[in-house]
C-alpha cells in the first residue's frame, strides 16, 4: 500500500517538474524574441508643408502700380519685373533721354555748360512744370540742365532740345535714333523732349523695361548725372532762381519714404501716365535702378519704390 502511494507521488512530482520545465522554456524563448527583434519606428505624419521654406527676404513685395521693374545697375540684370513689357506713357521720365543727349553733346564738344541759350517763344510758352523765364531771356546750358533734372522744368527741356538740334522736332528724331542704339524695344516712341502730351493727343510711350534700360545707360555712360539728381535744391545763376527736387525720397526726415543711398533719378506725371518714378540708390557696392509706372498718387510712387529698393538690397546685400 505504501509503495503504491509513493509511486503516485513520484509520478505527480515528475509531472509538476515537466510542467515547470516547459514554462521556463517558453519564457526564455519569449525574452529572446524581444531582444533580437529590430526596433520599429513609427513614421511621422505628413505636415503638408514644402521641404524648403522660402525666407521672407526672397518674397517680392506687392506693388500697386501699372508696371514695375528692378535691375542691377552694375550689369543690367533684372531682379524683379511686373507687366514690364506694356507700353505706357512715362511722362517726364522721358526727360532722361533729353539729359542723355545733352550730356552726349557736351562730351562730344558740340555743346558746353556755359553756352548761352536764348529762350524761344515756344519754349517760354510750354505748359506744366516750368521755371520763370520769358521769351528772349538767356540762360546757360548748365542752368537749364539743373532745372530739367531737379525741378523737371518742361520749358527747360524744350530750350535744351532747340539748342542741341536747332528744333525740338529734330531733337525728337535724335531721341528715337538713340533709343534704337541703346536697344530699347520697338514700343519706345518719343514724341517730344518734355514728356507732355501733344495737342493732337500723341505722347511718348515706353515700357518699364525700356525706362530701366534708359536709366541704366544714363548712369553707366554719364555717372555725373547723379551729382545733380541727388540735390534737393539748387540755385540757378539766372535771376538766382531756386529749383527744388520733385524726388521726395531725398528728404532724410521723411522716414516713410527715405532709403539709404538714394540719389536719383526722375519723376513723372501726366493725367494719362499717372504718377511715375525712376529711382536709383547705392548701398555698399550695390546699386539698383527701379521703375514704377501708373501709380495712383504722388506719394504712392515713392512708397512703392521704397518697397522695391528694400527688397532688392535684401537680396544683394
Residue ranges with predicted function:
Residues 1-13:
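N-terminal Sec-pathway targeting helices
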Residues 3, 30-209, 219:
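Active-site-adjacent loops and short helices of periplasmic peptidoglycan-processing enzymes
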Residues 33-35, 53-56, 61-65, 167-317:
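Penicillin-recognizing serine hydrolase domain
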Residues 9, 18-26, 105:
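Hydrophobic membrane-targeting alpha-helices
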Residues 22-33, 313:
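Hydrophobic single-pass membrane-insertion segments
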Amino acid at each position: 500500500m505504501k509503495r503504491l502511494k509513493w509511486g503516485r507521488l513520484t509520478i505527480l512530482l515528475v509531472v509538476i517538474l515537466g510542467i515547470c520545465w516547459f514554462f521556463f522554456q517558453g519564457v526564455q524563448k519569449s525574452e529572446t524574441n524581444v531582444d533580437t527583434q529590430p526596433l520599429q519606428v513609427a513614421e511621422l505624419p505628413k505636415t503638408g508643408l514644402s521641404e524648403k521654406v522660402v525666407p521672407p527676404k526672397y518674397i517680392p513685395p506687392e506693388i500697386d502700380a501699372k508696371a514695375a521693374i528692378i535691375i542691377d545697375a552694375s550689369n543690367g540684370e533684372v531682379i524683379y519685373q511686373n507687366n514690364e513689357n506694356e507700353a505706357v506713357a512715362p511722362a517726364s521720365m522721358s526727360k532722361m533721354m533729353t539729359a542723355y543727349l545733352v550730356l552726349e553733346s557736351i562730351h562730344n564738344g558740340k555743346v558746353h555748360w556755359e553756352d548761352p541759350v536764348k529762350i524761344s517763344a515756344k519754349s517760354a510758352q510750354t505748359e506744366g512744370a516750368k521755371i520763370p523765364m520769358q521769351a528772349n531771356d538767356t540762360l546757360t546750358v548748365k542752368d537749364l540742365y539743373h532745372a530739367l533734372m531737379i525741378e523737371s522744368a518742361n520749358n527747360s527741356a524744350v530750350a535744351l532740345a532747340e539748342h542741341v538740334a536747332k528744333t525740338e522736332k529734330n531733337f525728337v528724331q535724335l531721341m528715337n535714333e538713340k533709343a534704337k542704339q541703346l536697344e530699347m524695344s520697338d514700343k519706345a516712341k518719343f514724341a517730344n523732349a518734355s514728356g507732355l502730351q501733344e495737342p493732337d493727343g500723341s505722347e511718348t510711350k515706353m515700357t518699364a523695361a525700356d525706362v530701366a534700360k534708359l536709366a541704366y545707360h544714363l548712369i553707366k555712360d554719364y555717372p555725373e548725372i547723379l551729382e545733380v539728381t541727388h540735390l534737393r535744391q539748387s540755385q540757378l545763376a539766372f535771376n538766382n532762381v531756386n529749383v527744388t527736387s520733385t524726388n521726395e525720397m531725398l528728404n532724410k526726415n521723411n522716414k516713410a519714404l527715405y532709403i539709404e543711398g538714394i540719389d536719383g533719378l526722375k519723376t513723372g506725371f501726366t493725367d494719362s501716365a499717372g504718377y511715375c518714378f525712376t529711382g536709383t540708390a547705392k548701398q555698399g557696392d550695390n546699386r539698383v535702378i527701379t521703375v514704377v509706372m501708373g501709380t495712383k498718387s504722388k506719394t504712392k510712387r515713392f512708397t512703392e519704390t521704397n518697397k522695391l529698393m528694400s527688397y532688392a538690397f535684401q537680396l544683394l546685400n
